[in-house]
A protein has these predicted regions:
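Switch II (G3) loop of P-loop NTPases
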Residues: 1-15, 19, 38
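Conserved, well-folded catalytic cores of nucleic-acid-processing
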Residues: 10, 25-32, 56, 85-88, ...
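Conserved C-terminal guanine-recognition region of P-loop GTPase G domains, centered on the G4
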Residues: 16-91, 145, 162-171
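Charged, alpha-helix-enriched surfaces in structured cytosolic catalytic cores
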Residues: 13-24, 41-44, 48, 70-77, ...
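Conserved RecA-like P-loop NTPase ATPase core
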Residues: 3, 22, 33, 95, ...
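Canonical P-loop GTPase G-domain recognition
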Residues: 58-61, 67-130
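P-loop NTP-binding site
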Residues: 130-243
Length: 243
């Protein structure tokens, strides 16, 4: 499974990178899942995605999520609307929250997957390096803890990650990068409470991932407008040359 960034109108260089990743991925997979909310309105954003889908021969499964929030008659109307604008391989109304039709989604994925060699062992869950996963866990916990207090313009990089000799513990030093001084204060919180919360939540999940004790230390730095800096974007692991 490749969970691509959402296709959107980019407002900075990082956004452009994310959109390029999503659009390039369309040619590299065996089946595409397009997740939409229940609506019969197809705006410029949706139309742009449809135009991108027309450029590839990959089968596309449209998943209309959150159908538990609308009447059954409306669902039929939404399906008809999307059928008129693109020849989808399948259209599946579903609800991730209520686990409605999720089995059908999985079955349809297998229907369109070709047989091929097993590239990874059965117990392999990802091909990403541990440092990248740890950084993403910290960023995820930060975004959850901060909710809507700051934009998603934060990044995390791992300064140091090393196991202690003869001990079942790993020391991890990481930096949370934001774009504004005001954001730094919010991330740290009163008396460091917010940063402590982020660290505690991240540490718990990292310990589960690595199956060892973790000593996690977090710092917060301001890099003004880093999302428009090619150098910083690349340093944070978003390398456009690898798309």
């Amino acid at each position: 499974f490749l969970d691509t960034p959402g296709i959107h109108k980019a407002k900075n260089k990082l956004g452009e990178y994310m959109v390029n990743v999503a659009e390039h991925t369309l040619n590299e997979v065996d089946v595409i899942l397009w997740l939409v909310e229940p609506s019969n309105f197809i705006g410029a954003g949706e139309q742009h995605i449809i135009e991108q889908l027309k450029k590839v021969k990959t089968p596309v499964i449209l998943i209309i999520n959150k159908v538990d929030t609308v009447d059954r008659e409306k669902i039929v109307e939404y399906i008809d609307t999307y059928r008129k604008v693109y020849d989808f391989a399948e259209i599946i109304p579903a609800s991730a929250l209520r686990a409605k039709n999720l089995d059908t989604v999985i079955d349809m994925i297998f229907k369109y997957l070709p047989y091929g060699p097993q590239f990874y062992d059965e117990d392999t869950v990802t091909d990403q390096p541990e440092r990248a996963i740890v950084a993403e866990i910290i960023r995820e916990k930060a975004l959850h803890a901060l909710d809507d207090e700051i934009p998603h313009g934060i990044a995390v990089y791992i300064d140091r990650m090393k196991g202690r000799k003869g001990q079942n513990i790993i020391d991890i030093d990481a930096t949370i990068v934001c774009e504004r001084d005001s954001h730094k204060g919010i991330i740290i919180g009163k008396g460091g409470a917010m940063l402590k919360k982020i660290g505690s939540n991240a540490r718990y999940e990292i310990e589960r991932l690595l199956d060892t004790k973790v000593n996690l230390k977090l710092w917060v730095k301001v890099k003004k407008d880093w999302r428009d800096s090619d150098f910083l974007i690349k340093n944070f692991g978003y390398n456009k040359d690898e798309i």
